[in-house]
Amino acid sequence: MPNASWTVRRDRLVSLAALGVAPAGGPRLVRAVEGARRARLPRRALVELGLMLRLYAGYPAAIEFLRAVARTWPARTAARRHASYEDWQRWQRDGERLCRRVYGNGYDRLRAFMSSLDPDLDEWMILEGYGKTLTRGGLTVAERELATVSALAALGWSRQLGAHLEGAVRVGAPLAHVERARRTGERCRWTSRP
């Protein structure tokens, strides 16, 4: 049973997701990261959030977010080993599993649609998006979906937002949390997309 109380951690994560996708986050983003640190959010949770912002707002957003984390909370990063064939297989399997969990009965339709746009886009969605990024540790699946809702609302991507509003509930986020994440993102909206 998911925790029904809205936590400081969730509040900070959805606010940071909305701020993190804005192209001019700058000092405001740094202050928000400082606040998250004071609120005792783990640094890893912020790094994970920064990495996943690449999926919604591209590498510039991820770079600037992680730059704010590094400025506020310096740390050494560990060297990474090269991915093995088994890693790629696991990312594919875990990505398919998580995507199916988020999209529920709409999973097969989503995959067919993405393939119709371009088979590479479908593969990248599963492997890079769901497998390599969203199945990592540091954040729960529900926290990742709430951050996704906030980021998509801030960016104004209504189609994708609708799917992830439902997906967040499917992975265990209470509806009240999903609505709060959406409202947080909408308050931070920086674009005029319809």
What are the residue ranges of the model-derived segments?
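Acidic, glycine/proline-rich low-complexity segments that act as flexible tails and inter-domain linkers
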Residues: 1-12, 21-39, 44-48, 54-141, ...
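Contiguous, well-ordered alpha-helical segments that form the cores/surfaces of helical PPI scaffolds
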Residues: 12-22, 145-155, 183
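Intrinsically disordered, low-complexity segments enriched in Gly and acidic/Ser/Thr residues
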Residues: 159-160
